[in-house]
Amino acid sequence: SSAKFNLANLHLNTKRFDLAEEEYTEALRIYRRLAERNPSVYESDVAMTLYNFAILHSDTKRFDLAEEEYTESLEIRRRLAERDPYAFENDVATTLNNLANLHQNK
């Protein structure tokens, strides 16, 4: 699943949005399944994939999808930050910043 995620990032960075969407979809499906069995290990991967999916959807002007993904990512990251603020508060702040930018550009 990390290979799918990395491949999706490559496609996103090279503006191959359709391929990036396919890879993020697959990575998210795998991470969600893994998080069901072991949330303490994989929830952060779900949040990170949702966050990057939101960037993709924002870049492709699908703002409603991006908002949903940022919001879900933020919920997960806030939960993680409650348990380990040092490790996850920066992720919460970054997600809030991107969500604010999305609302500004909508």
Predicted regions and their residues:
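Residue signature of alpha-solenoid helical repeat architecture, marking inter-repeat boundaries
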Residues: 37-44, 83-90
